[in-house]
């Protein structure tokens, strides 16, 4: 049976009002609890670049902002048997979704979504766990589009490939990059990265075999030489003209695959032998997206099934200490601090850090 928990009549949440202004809403509705989910009191949230873009055509007035959360279970749906009240969980939300406007991470209470959540490992803080969800989801989607398998959570060592296979990760000091490089290593691939020199050690700590200064004028040739002109895979975690151009130029003579985290400038995608695609975060739920073109997507059962498999794998890897979190900048101060953190992210004031805000 469902464990009874009475939510307050209202809660506080961060939203965008009818004037397209990010607003702290103190009389926001509380979500209802589906039978196959749990209700969570949010203790910490992490900020992502996508949070700062939910304005204009991407905004549903008074829908909740926020993707990444961690918190304490306060109620359990009738069909859930493996979670109890008091357990700690972390997960991702489909923020600013018109179908479920009261489900966003930046709120006092939320309900888990699909199977895109997991229990917080022993020894992890809420802040550490909250930093993972978007990175896990995006890293998994990127590997899928690159055509690379997810790690085997039961393996004691990474598989030995017949010959070294390099994967270029442009923007190797970003939060998504540090997770995907760890996953690539666990799948047997060799990540090489680009970033600023002051973040070289960060990228190497999280799996990069070697790191290159993204500002090097001869970088494409340097990477071609390093990979013996056989680079087949490039993941672009920055996505601008310079990053797309570099990735296409670095891929070897036989061609390969390029994946970015946002729509890439097509005029920079100059080689027919390179297949290009980009990730869209909400597809991890299988729900599709109602955002304007080119971000609109239909729902997909295959996407939903992949999201569940990814999170089953990633939860094990995190639990076993095979994936570690990005360096954090933890900010106290609740919802006002979220607004301040969003400004830090929007204006590009971070390097090698992920902003996490304490709510609890």
UniProtKB/Swiss-Prot annotation:
Any Pfam family the entry gives? ADH_N
Database matches in InterPro entries: ADH-like_C (IPR013149), ADH-like_N (IPR013154), GroES-like_sf (IPR011032), NAD(P)-bd_dom_sf (IPR036291), PKS_ER (IPR020843), Trans-enoyl_RdTase-like (IPR047122)
Keywords, A to Z, come to:
NADP, Nucleotide-binding, Oxidoreductase
Per the record, the domain of life is: Eukaryota
Task: Report the EC code(s) recorded for this entry.
Answer: 1.-.-.-
Signals that turn on the gene: Expression is controlled by the monacolin K cluster transcription regulator mokH.
Give residues annotated as binding substrate.
Answer: 134-141, 281-285
Q: How is it used?
A: Monacoline K acts as an inhibitor of HMG-CoA reductase involved in cholesterogenesis. Its hypocholesterolemic activity might be useful for lowering cholesterol levels in the blood and reduce artherosclerosis and coronary heart disease.
Q: In which pathway does it act?
A: Polyketide biosynthesis; lovastatin biosynthesis
Q: Which residues does the annotation say bind NADP(+)? A: 50-53, 173-176, 196-199, 214, 261-262, 279, 350-351
Query: What GO molecular function annotations does the UniProt record carry, in alphabetical order?
Result: nucleotide binding; oxidoreductase activity, acting on NAD(P)H
- Stored CDD domains: enoyl_reductase_like
Would you identify the family this protein belongs to, as annotated?
A: Belongs to the zinc-containing alcohol dehydrogenase family.
Q: What is the protein's known function?
A: Dehydrogenase; part of the gene cluster that mediates the biosynthesis of monakolin K, also known as lovastatin, and which acts as a potent competitive inhibitor of HMG-CoA reductase. Monakolin K biosynthesis is performed in two stages. The first stage is catalyzed by the nonaketide synthase mokA, which belongs to type I polyketide synthases and catalyzes the iterative nine-step formation of the polyketide.
Q: Subunit arrangement?
A: Monomer.
- What name is this protein filed under? Dehydrogenase mokE
Can you name the source organism?
Monascus pilosus
Taxonomy of the source species: Eukaryota, Fungi, Dikarya, Ascomycota, Pezizomycotina
Primary gene name:
mokE
